[in-house]
Design a protein with these regions (language model features):
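Short coil/turn segments at alpha/beta junctions that flank glycine-rich nucleotide-binding fingerprints
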Residues: 26-30, 81, 103
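Helix-turn-helix
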Residues: 15, 23-57, 61
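Short, hydrophobic secondary-structure boundary micro-motifs
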Residues: 108-112, 122-124, 152
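Generic hydrophobic, amphipathic alpha-helix propensity
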Residues: 12-20, 37, 62-70, 136
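N-terminal intrinsically disordered/low-complexity leader segments
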Residues: 1-10
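Amphipathic alpha-helical packing segments from all-alpha helical-bundle domains
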Residues: 68-79, 83, 87, 91, ...
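Short amphipathic alpha-helical elements of helix-turn-helix/winged-helix folds
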Residues: 19-23, 99
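Short helix-capping/turn signature of helix-turn-helix
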Residues: 52, 112-118
């Protein structure tokens, strides 16, 4: 990757990120035209490849950028510092909703990339998933007060159960053409308060 990408104004960087998220979220890795990404970002295809050596590098950069954006937002929200599960979930929800508002296609891109089978990107995606899954589980459970739960409850399994249910909900919502962030917020608040 050409470091000149980071010298671009933030607005231009975000235009390229959002264009990549959008196009890759609509197609498989292989069938995503880089010309559409360039057009959506308002740059030429040759300039896109000036910043990113090839399509694979752009795709994997976007994948890692999603993880970075998410981790930074969650850490900034303070959700990992909470000892109460529901306070933690609420703060995490607000952080993720803000991400969805700023990067409307990022969630769909993440879900598509998570299930992508193209051998060009699959090994790198799987390696990254393993790295971040360990971080996420350990960080979330680190500060929870076990006294707030039934004795003997497996906190990690409880967390994974809620994570998988959330992922299923998001996957269902992503099957529609347009994500309604306000609807997602209302549904998750109902689930947290249930």
């Amino acid at each position: 990757m050409n470091k000149k990408f980071f010298a671009l104004p933030v607005q231009k960087q975000e235009a390229i990120l959002n264009a990549g998220f959008c196009v890759f979220s609509q197609n498989s890795y292989k069938k995503s035209p880089t010309s559409e990404i360039a057009d959506a970002a308002g740059i030429s295809k040759s300039l896109l490849f000036h910043y990113f050596y090839n399509k694979r590098e752009l795709y994997l950069f976007l994948w890692e950028k999603c993880a970075q954006i998410t981790m930074e937002a969650l850490e900034k929200s303070g959700c990992y510092e909470q000892t109460d599960l529901f306070d933690s979930m609420n703060l995490g929800l607000q952080a993720k909703l803000e991400i969805m508002r700023r990067y409307p296609h990022m969630g769909t891109f993440v879900m598509k990339a998570y299930y992508e089978k193209d051998p060009d990107v699959l090994p790198a995606i799987q390696e990254s998933i393993a790295k971040y899954a360990d971080f996420k589980t350990n960080t979330v459970l680190l500060n929870l007060n076990p006294e707030h739960f039934i004795e003997g409850l497996d906190l990690e399994m409880m967390y994974l159960d809620m994570l998988w249910a959330s992922e299923g909900y998001i996957w269902e919502k992503l099957q529609h053409d347009h994500i309604n962030v306000d609807e997602i917020e209302a549904d998750f608040i109902k689930l947290i308060d249930f």
